[in-house]
Amino acid sequence: MKRTYQPSVTRRKRTHGFRVRMKTRGGRAVLNARRAKGRKRLAV
């Protein structure tokens, strides 16, 4: 069985990047929650 995590910078940015988070209301909610919690990194 192959390993499920095959890293790719492109795919990572496209699915979890900052701009993707900003697109939807839910994504912005995620960023705001992370800001409120004081996360050092908001998105990938």
Curated annotation (Swiss-Prot):
InterPro entries per the UniProt record, alphabetical: Ribosomal_bL34, Ribosomal_bL34_CS
GO cellular component: ribonucleoprotein complex; ribosome
Record PROSITE patterns: RIBOSOMAL_L34
GO biological process, one term: translation
Keyword tags: Ribonucleoprotein, Ribosomal protein
Superkingdom: Bacteria
GO molecular function, one term: structural constituent of ribosome
Protein family: Belongs to the bacterial ribosomal protein bL34 family.
PANTHER family according to UniProt: LARGE RIBOSOMAL SUBUNIT PROTEIN BL34M, MITOCHONDRIAL RIBOSOMAL PROTEIN 34 FAMILY MEMBER
The protein's name: Large ribosomal subunit protein bL34
Taxonomic source organism: Bordetella petrii (strain ATCC BAA-461 / DSM 12804 / CCUG 43448)
